[in-house]
Amino acid sequence: LNVGCIPSKALLDSSEHFINAKNHFKEHGIDIPEPKLNLTQMIKRKSEVVKSNVDGIAFLMKKNKIEVFKGVGSFVDKNTIKVTSSDGKETIIKTEKVIIATGSKPTPLPFAPFDKKRIISSTECLELKELPKHLIVIGGGIIGMELGSVYARLGSKVTVVEFLDSLIPTMDGTMGKELLKVTKKLGIEFYLGHKVTSLENKGKVVIIKAEAKDHKTIELKGDYCLVSIGRRPYTDALALDKVGIETVKGQIPVDDHLRTKVDNIYAIGDVVRGAMLAHKAEEEGVYVAEQLDGQKPHVNYLLIPGVVYTWPEVASVGYTEEQLKEQGRTYKIGSFPYKALGRARASMDTDGLVKVLADKQTDEILGMHIIGARAADMIAAGVTAMEFRASAEDVARMSHAHPTYMEAVKEACLAATANRPLHV
């Protein structure tokens, strides 16, 4: 809300408006003077969006009569929490149940901590006062690709250095390959399969050295370096030792009910196992609340979608093709390209495809992976279909409005069912 999902999407949208005005308005018959970037206003709007959302949450807390204490919370014992405010004042809270939901923070390189000036995390990258001339991004995952895209659109030279041989490695391999193609068209430079060996701040220049698998080295110089190699649970100040909880690789161990080893203490979100996603944390929060109310809730972790808010967007749910191969499961693939989609042509957003994985015997949809315009919204169709164990044929036989991006899902399901998409 403050330094993650919402501010990054605000900047992604603003930067997309900017590049469209600069490069695509003329094709739509809109003649305007050359647009000029006002980064100060862009950052200001982002902050206003964040404030609006924060104020909305504060209103909901008040409406539901939830008391809020601002400060650093830590355990005194399993039924006592101490909150230390910024002015050093301490407040003691007595409680029957505790839910730990403290989130995560960016992980630095072991040999180069964040200086928050030139070697920055996503937090500082959302608050830059100047447009980088050359932004070097370490890490080709979701955060690196999203923020790298923002500054590439605004005119920065952007270079991505990734240790693995593919982008967004946790998603289906086809998505990473397609994202590489489209972001190269944006002008982003990539060094895949490179391990960063040194990173130094030399005043107004950062110098990075990286080594490929064949031991050849490269040296890159930029004015900012965004380190986006992952995040780690934020548990440092909780005083977990006071209640006998030990972390494992930084995470708080929980059982299938999200309960810790201490019977009245639960943990959710980024501090526990699983993907570090806001909507996963939300599902877990609802799960624990309903459980404490005596209900019998359920979270299907396989069907928690993942999204990359580049443009085109990338969205995924269910199994990847790589996972199905590893399981030895027989499957079939249905794919449909955006360039064959009337709605995509009308919007001039023809990069991308929909990929559906279905069981070879039963036709049940096992995974859906989309790269293209509106993918973040479209993936809900995959979640719904898989939640009710629909087959590819089930979706293919449903009427989809024309012209829409969702028709690509229908066509991909037709391709998976009997290799008979209508428009390719």
Predicted feature locations:
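Glycine-rich flavin
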Residues: 1-131, 159, 164-168, 174-175, ...
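Flexible, glycine-rich terminal cap/loop adjacent to redox cofactors
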Residues: 6, 10-17, 309-320, 325-424
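Short, acidic, Ser/Thr-enriched surface-loop or helix-capping motifs
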Residues: 70, 212, 255-257, 359-360
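Gly/Ala-rich phosphate-binding loop of Rossmann-like dinucleotide-binding domains
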Residues: 148, 152-153
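N-terminal Rossmann-fold NAD(P) dinucleotide-binding loop
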Residues: 144-145
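FAD-site-proximal beta/loop scaffold in flavoenzymes
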Residues: 115-132, 219-293, 381, 396
